[in-house]
């Protein structure tokens, strides 16, 4: 069987948006009067937005309505901060590798648990190099479940 496609995770493989997330969580924490620094932020990496907020609150009481509002606010801050994201924020070698794969006639799939994947791809100008995208809207279960990758295989990537 020959290789027909490559599937890439977005964050940490093609780009690194961790600082954008940190600044959004920091802004929310400051508004809520909760101490928050980069060391505390490390516990939020790779964790869902809800679980991240629970870790940020560290046992402080909150209603479901507050939780929803704070998660939405953090995401809004994050998306606003992405306005500064450009193709220069691709990790070294990522663009060259994607172009080489396409020149070889192979397909490229991008899999990310984020529901902001499409916004990130817009700012990185990666749409011309992606044959298919699977994101947090594409599947019910995201990582560590394999559904993002299985979704791409189902659409023949």
Predicted feature residues:
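A short, structured active-site edge motif that brings together acidic residues
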Residues: 40-45, 128-142
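Active-site neighborhood of HAD-like aspartate-dependent phosphohydrolases
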Residues: 2-42
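Short, acidic loop-to-helix structural element flanking the phosphoryl-transfer center
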Residues: 80-110
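Short loop-to-alpha-helix "cap/lid" segments that border enzyme active sites
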Residues: 143-153
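Conserved phosphate-coupling serine/threonine residues in phosphotransfer and NTP-handling enzymes
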Residues: 112-114
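Conserved small/polar residues in nucleotide/adenosyl-binding loops
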Residues: 155-157
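A metal-dependent, Asp-based hydrolase signature
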Residues: 46-81, 95, 99-100
